[in-house]
Amino acid sequence: MATTVKELKATARPKSGKGAARAERRAGRVPGVIYGNNQPPVTISIEDRELRQRILAGRFLTTLVDIDLEGKKHRVIPRDYHLDPVKDFPIHVDFMRLGEGATIRISVPLHVVKSEASPGVKRGGTVNIVAHAIELECGVESIPQYIEADVGSLEIGHSLHLSDVKLPAGVKALTREDATLVTIVPPSGYAEEQKAAAAAAAGGAAPAAAAPAAGAAAPAAAAPAAAAKAPAGGDKKK
């Protein structure tokens, strides 16, 4: 599977520490770091506006990035970012450097599909997403943007497990196979309706069992004696 690689420009940050980071933010830049692949970490800064757009676009943590650091390319993947707790803008970002042919453990979002075709949803049930992401291990060139969870055949009360999901080639799940991903939750009052329907069915079956089978013959009348005896003391021939 081909993985999309985005480009991002960065500037080397010669100083580290809280004071230097605050100075970068005042200048409209977000401090960050590139680490990993048995190389020393490199402190960088990125334009706040550009980084914010990348984060808001979605799938930021599963997208490969080529960081252009003063003419030198670094193939990385975002591993974490921090937002200001009040103003909600990025204040720091971490990138992990990737070597050629490396494998990576990554959390990939779950994408539910065909919910409108689910028999359970058609009967008033609701799709309940239990796991919003799946932990995977794969090559850096095979990172899926998301994993599809097809719920088109689920009835009310049924669940979709990890073992029901087809993963792309070369991708291994780190979560146990029986993990529940999605369930179809019954609507309000569904249990009472089911009990009432079962009681009505049981009540209708009892009188039916007591009634005689259709077309059954009525009890036969007592058969007359095969040959009636002559009355005792009858007239004799003279």
Swiss-Prot record:
InterPro entries: Rbsml_bL25/Gln-tRNA_synth_N, Ribosomal_bL25/Gln-tRNA_synth, Ribosomal_bL25_b-dom, Ribosomal_bL25_C, Ribosomal_bL25_long, Ribosomal_L25_dom, Ribosomal_P1/P2_euk, Ribosomal_uL5_bac-type
GO biological process: translation
Annotated S-S bridges: none
Cellular compartments per GO CC: cytosolic large ribosomal subunit
Keywords: Ribonucleoprotein, Ribosomal protein, RNA-binding, rRNA-binding
Molecular function terms from GO: 5S rRNA binding; structural constituent of ribosome
Bias (Basic and acidic residues): 1-10
Keyword Nucleotide-binding: no
Signal sequence extent: none
Region (Disordered): 1-24
CDD domains: Ribosomal_L25_TL5_CTC (cd00495)
Source species, domain of life: Bacteria
Record bears the keyword Ribosomal protein: yes
Complex formation: Part of the 50S ribosomal subunit; part of the 5S rRNA/L5/L18/L25 subcomplex. Contacts the 5S rRNA. Binds to the 5S rRNA independently of L5 and L18.
Protein family (similarity comment): Belongs to the bacterial ribosomal protein bL25 family. CTC subfamily.
Function field: This is one of the proteins that binds to the 5S RNA in the ribosome where it forms part of the central protuberance.
Protein name per its UniProtKB record: Large ribosomal subunit protein bL25
Organism field: Bradyrhizobium diazoefficiens (strain JCM 10833 / BCRC 13528 / IAM 13628 / NBRC 14792 / USDA 110)
Lineage of source species: Bacteria, Pseudomonadati, Pseudomonadota, Alphaproteobacteria, Hyphomicrobiales
